[in-house]
Amino acid sequence: MYYIVEITSRGSETFLEGFEDIGEAWDVVSRLRCEARRRRQKVRYEVR
């Protein structure tokens, strides 16, 4: 199982969703990163 983790500028981590397929997880991370850039949020996303 692959999980998306949201990491804030303060270092706090929030586990968002779990995915069976790593490709699907990375697609969601890509969309989240684009949305964060549009909102100018200082957030990082990883798949673990």
Q: Language-model segments: what does each one mean?
A:
Residues 3-7:
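A short beta-strand micro-motif
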Residues 13-17, 26, 30-48:
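Short, mixed-charge low-complexity intrinsically disordered segments
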